[in-house]
Amino acid sequence: MADNSSDEYEEDNKEKKKPSQLTPQQGFSENDDDDDDDSSETDSDDDDDDEEHGAPLEGAYDPADYEHLPVSAEIKELFEYISRYTPQLIDLDHKLKPFIPDFIPAVGDIDAFLKVPRPDGKPDHLGLLVLDEPSTKQSDPTVLSLWLTENSKQHNITQHMKVKSLEDAEKNPKAIDTWIESISELHRSKPPATVHYTRPMPDIDTLMQEWSPEFEELLGKVSLPTVEIDCSLAEYIDMICAILDIPFYKSRIQSLHLLFSLYSEFKNSQHFKALAEGKKTFTPPSNSASQAGDAETLSFL
């Protein structure tokens, strides 16, 4: 009986040891499952990366297409540099620079059709047949067409132009003043006319250069010829052009154009305006009368 009891005790211990020995193996298997899950996730991520980066683009370089080319080893080595190259991704900084545009689109607000009805109840069709916009300063169609014609340089094109007319102009002086102001602005904005001379002519800047001291000293003694001189108009033009170094020919139209252009430049020059104002404020010396008398005696006859 003692032997049987001891045998039964040993069998019970063996049965208890078996599950205790199996438990760490089960724990190890659970860790293995976690590792397998992690590895599967990383593999899936790698596959996704391969799909994103490794997917060949349409028309991309494929080395297999150029392996059969009968070229030397040096050329083949050059082809390998194509696959070795990896482009750099450069992030460009975008800077917001607000600015005022030259032209602003004239897009009006959406009409909500919140109209005040007329007292008599008649429909005014405001917003349907008549524009319901603020009374801003509208452009005159005739003046606008003149501006477009001037800017496009299309003066010789025959086209039908609308001639503006006013009814009861005596009672509407404001419209006349507006028309005069707009036309004056159009003429002021016109560039100066360009004239191509058929004969050689000096530049305006060359003619505006200072005279030599000897010539200026001579002008202090001898006055310029006036219109009272006894000569014809053609001779007087030749005389003035010769003094100002303007060449003149048989037809004096181009010489006169250059003469008046030179006069306009002197008149509009700020430098000579300041000199003229300075001479006005300057009081002449006492012997100016005697100098004037000498100048009269030495004038051209």
Swiss-Prot record:
Pfam families: IFT46_B_C (PF12317). Residues 1-12, 30-52 have a biased composition (Acidic residues). InterPro entries: Intraflagellar_transp_cmplxB. Residues 1-66 are annotated as: Disordered. One of its GO terms (cellular component) is centrosome. Belongs to the IFT46 family. This is Intraflagellar transport protein 46 homolog. The lineage of its organism: Eukaryota, Metazoa, Chordata, Craniata, Vertebrata.
